[in-house]
UniProtKB/Swiss-Prot annotation:
Membrane-spanning segments: none
UniProt enzyme class: lyase
Name of the encoding gene: hisB
Native source species: Brucella anthropi (strain ATCC 49188 / DSM 6882 / CCUG 24695 / JCM 21032 / LMG 3331 / NBRC 15819 / NCTC 12168 / Alc 37)
Name of this protein: Imidazoleglycerol-phosphate dehydratase
InterPro entries given in the database record: IGPD_sf, ImidazoleglycerolP_deHydtase, ImidazoleglycerP_deHydtase_CS, Ribosomal_Su5_D2-typ_SF
Length: 202
């Protein structure tokens, strides 16, 4: 993580189901140290870090003897909280971004407003219930938890795709790329809050 960055935060969250520790640096270079016990999910979070350039450390222990649900959802909660904490008042950020991202057979669009208002629009249809041992429905559960706790409006639209691994990966990469743009410091706004309300607290 960069020595100059002040947009850093750490969150620890423990329940009877999971124990999560997350650290982020919004002005990083996409370094990651991620261990959740869920291999496919680790791979997706690595994509999120690498392509957003947010340095991430995620250590999660959960009740995987039951299933992956609590671990994935609670990681989304903690990661969202860490990003919200690192953003503070959200001064000087670009705020908005959208893009379509191609990955082989798949095209996925993501749009974000780092507004302080939490909302998820999800237009994705996986054609199988699992990718390996990972439940595909947990991709939505992660982004629902992430958006609600980061305080962002997030729209995710998979336009087409035949391979479910590619669909999932394109979602994480597309979200990463719009976060990279929206969380950047805008040199023309400096310390201004990018809202006519004067606040991005929701």
């Amino acid at each position: 993580m960069t020595a100059e960055s002040t947009r850093k935060a750490s969150i620890e969250r423990s329940t009877k189901e999971t124990s999560i520790a997350v650290s982020v640096d919004l002005d990083g270079v996409g370094k990651f140290d991620i261990t959740t016990g869920v291999g496919f999910f680790d791979h997706m979070l690595e994509q999120l870090s690498r392509h957003s350039l947010i340095d991430m450390r995620v250590m999660a222990k959960g009740d995987l003897h039951i299933d992956d649900h609590h671990t994935v959802e609670d990681t989304g909660i903690a990661l969202g909280q860490a990003i919200a904490k690192a953003l503070g008042e959200r001064r000087g950020i670009v705020r908005y971004a959208s893009m379509d991202l191609a990955m082989d057979d798949t095209l996925t669009g993501a749009a974000v407003d780092v507004s302080g208002r939490a909302f998820l629009v999800w237009n994705v249809n996986f054609t199988t219930s699992k990718i390996g041992t990972f439940d595909t429905e947990l991709v939505r559960e992660f982004f629902q938890a992430f958006a609600m706790n980061a305080g962002i409006t997030l729209h995710i639209n998979n336009h087409y795709g035949a391979n479910n691994h590619h669909i999932a990966e394109s979602i994480f990469k597309a979200v990463a790329r719009v976060l990279r743009t929206a969380l950047e410091t805008d040199p023309r706004q400096k310390d201004a809050i990018p809202s006519t309300k004067g606040s991005l607290k929701g």
